[in-house]
């Protein structure tokens, strides 16, 4: 089962409106951010968990500003709530792992993406994602 299939399954298992909006990802849907984070030395103890939580946060970003991969809804309010829920899901799982460095790095990504959207600078959001994923993975030269 792919990381995005696992994320969709978790949303369905929670029940409620998000479960109803959860869909299987398209074949070949990109989960590269989670895969990159999971492949780094900082995620070595729990790579599958890191892949899932990074992709949960990425899905939250896409629910807010783009095209989500495992959610389908025409209700903009539900999409925003889903995005917030997915941000919280990923950050909560990181906190449970005790990885405060990664919590900070991905919280910074969320803030930078909100700023980039407000300023209509999508390239800044993608740059923030690249920096954040490298930081979570431990491949960025930053201290942990």
Label the predicted regions.
Residues 3-144:
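Mg2+-dependent prenyl diphosphate-binding active-site environment of isoprenoid biosynthetic enzymes
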């Amino acid at each position: 089962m792919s990381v995005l299939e696992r994320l969709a399954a978790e949303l369905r298992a929670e029940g409620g409106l998000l479960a109803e909006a959860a869909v299987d990802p398209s074949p070949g849907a990109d989960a590269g951010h989670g895969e990159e984070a999971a492949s780094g030395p900082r995620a070595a103890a729990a790579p599958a968990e890191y892949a899932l939580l990074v992709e949960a946060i990425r899905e939250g970003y896409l629910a807010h500003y783009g095209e989500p991969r495992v959610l389908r809804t025409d209700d903009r309010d539900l999409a925003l709530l889903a995005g917030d829920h997915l941000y919280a899901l990923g950050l909560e799982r990181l906190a449970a792992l005790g990885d405060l460095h990664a919590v900070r790095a991905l919280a910074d990504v969320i803030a930078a993406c909100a700023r980039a959207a407000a300023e209509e600078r999508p390239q800044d959001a993608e740059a923030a994602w690249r920096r954040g994923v490298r930081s979570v993975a431990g491949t960025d030269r930053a201290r942990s």
